[in-house]
């Protein structure tokens, strides 16, 4: 199956269009066929008026894109991948994955060819490059470049072509034996830096896309200047590393693709991410030795802080529960400063008391024994009270056979029964007194009769 091969050409990049299957067209004229539907006056030239003013019209009815207005997309940053050299344009020709030696294709492996084809076809270059030619003079003044949906395609298309050109240059430099490798590496690094500065200068000016002034922290210009300043110190490090490296080193000096340069803004963002939590505080243990990042030579002296394991600490949270049964407090209202001091002292006292009052095992066992003894005695008392009620119920004639009689009924019936028994007792006592008197009388009469008979 045939794909595409990247071939270097010595012509300047301005002569090569981004897509060979589409011709250069000015798509501003495509709106002329539907212009009467958008404007009342057919003779009005809307795009010319906007290009002269270089500002968006104030009336929403004059611009259909005003309804979809969003913040413009900033231009893409220059590529940081390895092996970028002097600018050269990319021609697209069919080739096969067999790796023939003709045409310089034998130096590419299958994985490299697939990666180049993926980057060529996967970057939406066809969808982005057919709109208009970026080398055209009217490209910067085009109305589509100021729209939020089309403002980022030009820089992406240029960077795709530069990426494809860089792969072949890097492979040729690494594949061909060169006795003066240190000199070639120095020239490659210097060309790489020049290409980065050229790519940054060829990006779209943000003032064209978004003419209104922004803050220093959010303006795209400041981002571009930060990028250029981040790349500027890397040239010294690259040159110094090439001078210190031996001549016979088999590996050329290239920048790592997956490691972006670390700047001071990255370290500041990582420091801002370390926040404290109220109950569980997260702390980072600092390593004894500072570890510098040797993987990316474009760090420019900034070292990334090492990632250390997180340590969770439990903090004491004092909870104060209100005692509703206590009488209202009569303390005086202290000032705010004194109240804060007293509260802090009280909290510290509670913490110290909680630490000190760790009860020994002996006191715990004694409390358990006391509690068990109290439970046993309470159970015995309840059982005795129940048995006494049952005995009282059995003494009452009305409740003698009623096993489900409640305690209140038992007490009432027992009280009535006691009163009746006491009344009967008084009656019997009075009868006994009468009988005693009768007996005394009879005794006295019998004594008289006996004396008379004698």
From Swiss-Prot:
**Record annotation: effect of changing residue 74 to A:** In a Burkitt lymphoma sample
- UniProt biased composition (Acidic residues): 266-278
Q: Which residues does the record list as Phosphothreonine (modified residue)? A: 23, 73, 330
A single GO BP = positive regulation of cell population proliferation
Q: Which residues carry this modification: N6-acetyllysine?
A: 158, 163, 172, 290, 332, 338, 386
**What stretch of residues is annotated with the motif UBR5-degron?**
370-379
Which SUPFAM superfamilies would you find in this protein's record?
Answer: HLH, helix-loop-helix DNA-binding domain (SSF47459)
Quick one: where's region Helix-loop-helix motif?
383-421
Which parts of the sequence are annotated with region: Disordered?
219-310
* Disorder named in the UniProt entry: A chromosomal aberration involving MYC may be a cause of a form of B-cell chronic lymphocytic leukemia. Translocation t(8;12)(q24;q22) with BTG1.
- What is the recorded name of this protein? Myc proto-oncogene protein
